[in-house]
From Swiss-Prot:
Its EC number is 2.7.11.1. It is an enzyme of class 2 (transferase). Glycans are attached at N57, N102, N167, N213, N220, N241, N261, N292, N328, N360, N414. Residues 520-770 form the Protein kinase domain. The chain crosses the membrane at residues 440-460. This is Serine/threonine-protein kinase-like protein CCR1. It catalyses: L-seryl-[protein] + ATP = O-phospho-L-seryl-[protein] + ADP + H(+); L-threonyl-[protein] + ATP = O-phospho-L-threonyl-[protein] + ADP + H(+). Expressed in roots, leaves, shoot apical meristems (SAM), and floral buds. One of its GO terms (cellular component) is membrane. ATP binds at L526, G527, R528, G529, S530, Y531, G532, F533, V534, K548.
Length: 775
């Protein structure tokens, strides 16, 4: 009994542990190993619970669906095995453990780039299901029971993971130092592990710490209840259940300068000589211990964090992207985390507890992603925030399905937020001075308007009486055909000009666009694609616009500099036959692009989806205008732009029935430019064939289903009239339609050298459009 007691340090503290922290020796959606072979892993947000790993000397076993994780790992060694999907992760010295998402079995692996680093569970425990797992410095303890079960308590198993003396590889074996008759008979709710000790919450109440080094922790009997535990190598910190304050035991240097009593936390992580926690109010990270914490991100909230020896990584709450920083004073990371979306928490059976919300996967704007968990009945419960970081104010409180919303102080427009943002002294120093400023602005504006009217009265008559002089805007848009008239006998020159083009892009506030789209609600949605969602919006001044909102995947896979470069180019290009960018917003990490609204939908809708049919005169004008838009992108835009996805659904019709080319992007590889330009020509030829025949590009109900395969042989035989759309009455003069067929056939030739340029096509189709006026 004395030997047993020497191995066992028992503290019956009235302790409640509903979920562990994400620290060393505990478990969470992100974890880190220690030592010279340190590496990190996190559970991704794909809905498959795949594991992403990165580290300086880590040979990625490449998760089945994550191809980019290895790109951020310094080691170039490739491994031939996969890490299975996990429900939870926990890190030790040079290895990580987890619970498999499908079987609840334990799985441990190291940083070694071979299968020998993947068998770190003794045979006796490999088929056992576990509900909790905690990797210590060189041992692992786990609570028996199915992870997703409503009953998450059970007896524990412990085993040792040590280094072989001959080749420094890791091996797993049972460890009698952690076995005790008292421990084996107890039922645990949770478990955490450190260097030579483990601590767990007992189902009947209290906490038990056991192992060779457990007596060094120096626990004192207390009646406090605790919510979260994190174990360092020689210390433990816990979050009080009611006050959310932190208490620590063990090695003093690990928790020197620990948080003040008024600091409240929801999560903890531990390194060898430090602890870090996520604050309850604004979800920012605060650290303490014997390290340098000057590099902690300020103004950023986190969902989960994990620490190795000198690096802390976390999952940002605003976009679920990984962020890492040093805690030893060095500003240079030895490796960067991968650009992947990570799970904000662990999947579990609901409902969520008080002061928690169920994370909604739809906010990631990922098509077909409805849950972050492999089992759809499970959910990720995240702690609610109650306050915001400096520079933001609380605009919406936490609900059952969403966290609180923080809005930049730059958007503060009333007294409810001015106190928080401290705007009284800086923005509203004196009411009378503010009124005087408004008066000066009003008088100045009126005087300017009067001056403009006087100048206009003098200058405009001279312009009107000088028909031979054209201004720059007229020259720029003189080739545009405006609103089509149903009277086809009207001369082409008398067709009304296209609407004016917005001369510059506007910077919008996020709040403006949220209001304009009714909070980006589904009933405002116009469409969706790989970039994100497109919403119909009505601005405060009554203008109708289309707002394209990038999804999270687009944001993290697009370099910020690349986006800024593309945005600068899009802001500067203007033409009456493209959908022009009106403005943008990048507040709160969003990427919102505001475009002209096209009320008559797409060409595809009118040709194939039962919308109002288009007359032959209008179809040919649309063909010509589309060619003009592509010609501008190819030859006049700076730098020139290759569309890359020319199709009838990317030809939009504005309020005047003018064709506008939409959804064009940039090409960065100069080696592919010529090929891509010819691809634009080919795809434009397919659009011409759709206009001519009324058939889709691919129609499985037709034989042959490919429109090019069906039409080209007929056109080359001189029988183009046989493929003309029969749902529209043939005009008296079919010659323009036959010319249109010939132009389309040139575009879809297999040899790019035989294809015309967009300038040639625009010129030819302009002549065809003139001939079409005598239908």
């Amino acid at each position: 009994m004395e030997t047993r007691c020497s191995l066992l340090f028992l503290s019956l503290i009235l302790l409640y542990l509903p979920k562990p922290g994400s620290g060393f020796g505990s478990s969470g959606p992100i974890a880190a190993s220690f030592g010279g072979s340190a590496f990190f892993c996190a559970i991704d947000a794909s809905g498959r619970q795949d594991v992403i790993c990165w580290g300086k000397n880590y040979s990625s076993p490449s998760s089945p669906s994550s191809s980019s994780s290895s790109s951020s790992i310094a080691s170039s060694t490739s491994a031939s095995y996969n890490i299975p999907s996990m429900a939870v992760l926990s890190g030790g010295d040079g290895f990580l453990c987890g619970i498999l998402s499908n079987t609840s079995q334990a799985f441990c692996f190291s940083s070694l780039g071979s299968s020998s680093g993947m068998d770190l569970v003794p045979l006796a425990y490999r088929t056992t299901a576990y509900s909790q797992i905690a990797a210590g410095n060189s041992h692992v303890c786990a609570v028996r029971g199915a992870y997703y079960s409503d009953h998450d308590s059970g007896t524990i198993d412990c085993w040792e993971i040590t280094r072989a003396t001959n080749n420094n590889s890791l091996i797993a074996k049972e460890n009698p130092n952690f076995y005790d008759q008292i421990v084996s008979n107890l039922v645990f709710n949770n478990i955490v592990s450190g260097d030579g000790f483990s601590c767990g919450g007992i189902r009947d109440g209290g906490m038990l710490c056991f192992g060779p080094n457990s007596s060094n922790l120096g626990f004192n009997t207390t009646s406090d209840n605790f919510q979260v535990l994190a174990a360092g190598k020689n210390s433990v910190c816990a979050i009080l259940n009611l006050s959310r304050e932190v208490k620590c035991w063990g090695e003093d240097e690990s928790f020197v300068n620990s948080p003040m009593n008024d600091s409240r936390f929801v999560s903890l992580t531990a390194g060898p000589r430090h602890f870090c926690g996520i604050r309850e109010d604004n979800h920012e990270v605060e650290c303490w211990g014997n390290s340098n914490f000057s590099l902690i991100p300020k103004g950023s909230g986190f969902k989960a964090i994990a620490s190795s020896d000198f690096i802390v990584c976390g999952i940002r709450e605003e976009d679920l992207v990984l962020d890492c920083w040093m805690v030893n004073g060095s500003s240079t990371l030895a490796y960067d985390p991968p650009l992947e979306l990570c799970s904000p928490g662990m999947c579990r059976a609901g409902p969520c507890n008080e002061k928690e919300f169920a994370f909604n996967a739809s906010i990631l704007n990922e098509p077909d992603l409805t849950s972050l968990c492999v089992r759809k009945e499970l959910m990720v419960c995240s702690p609610c925030g109650s306050d915001c970081s400096h520079g933001f104010f609380l605009s919406s409180s936490c609900t059952a399905n969403s966290d609180r919303i923080c809005t930049p102080c730059s958007l503060c427009q009333n007294s409810s937020c001015s106190d928080i943002c401290k705007l009284h002294n800086s923005n509203f120093p004196d009411k009378h001075w503010h009124q005087l400023q408004r008066l000066v602005l009003i008088i100045g504006s009126c005087a300017s308007a009067l001056l403009i009217i006087i100048i206009g009265c003098c200058v405009v008559p001279r312009i009107v009486t000088s028909p031979n002089k054209e201004d720059g805007a007229a020259n720029q848009f003189k080739s545009c055909i405006g609103k089509p008239d149903l009277d086809t006998d009207q001369p082409l020159e008398n067709v009304s000009p296209a609407p004016s083009v917005t001369p510059f892009a506007q910077v919008f506030r996020l709040s403006e666009l949220k209001d304009a789209t009714n909070g980006f609600k589904e009933f405002n949605e116009l469409g969706r694609g790989s970039y994100g969602f497109v919403y119909k919006a009505v601005l405060a001044d009554g203008r109708q616009v289309a707002v394209k909102r990038a999804n999270a995947a687009t944001i993290i896979h697009t370099n910020t500099r690349e986006f800024e470069t593309e945005l600068e180019i899009l802001c500067n290009i203007r033409h009456c036959n493209i959908v022009n960018l009106l403005g943008y917003s990048t507040e709160m990490g969003e990427r919102l692009l505001v475009y002209e609204y096209m009320p008559h939908g797409t060409l595809h809708d009118h040709l194939h989806s039962g919308f109002s049919p288009l007359s032959w005169s209008l179809r040919i004008k649309i063909a010509m205008q589309t060619a003009k838009g592509l010609e501008y992108l190819h030859n006049e835009a700076e730098p020139r732009i290759i569309h890359g996805d020319v199709k009838s659904s990317n030809v939009l019709l504005d309020s005047e029935w003018v064709a506008r080319v939409a959804d064009f992007g940039l090409v960065t590889s100069s080696n592919e430019k010529n090929l891509d330009i010819k691809r634009d020509v080919y795809d434009f030829g397919v659009v011409l064939l759709e206009i001519l025949t009324g058939r889709k590009r691919y129609d499985r109900d037709c034989d042959p289903p490919e429109i090019v395969e069906w039409t080209v042989p007929v056109i080359r035989e001189g029988k183009a009239a046989a493929i003309v759309d029969t749902y529209i009455a043939l005009p008296r003069n079919v010659e323009p339609l036959l010319k249109l067929a010939d132009v389309a056939e040139l575009c879809v030739r297999e040899d790019p050298n035989q294809q015309p340029t967009m300038s040639e096509l625009a010129n030819w189709l302009e002549h065809v459009a003139r001939d079409a006026l005598i239908f």
